Amino acid sequence: MKEWKAVALKYPENAEAPFISAVGKGLAAEKILEIAKEHSIPVVENEIAADVLSVQEIGSMIPENTWEIVAQIFSVVVKYEKM
């Protein structure tokens, strides 16, 4: 059985790119998803992004090679918020 991964991102207005605000695997990933649901934070499932971002340091800016895929994720979130 595959272990779930979750990565929470924060994108401050003046930042060059989003930052990793939380990372979890297994039960920790489930907790991140639970907190997101409790606070009506949109969740986007993207296994490739989760694999790459889940090994980054919490508080670090996302790697430049992930900017395009993360931009696509944020695009989905913005569309969701406009609904």
Regions found by a protein language model. Name each.
Residues 1-83:
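Divalent-cation
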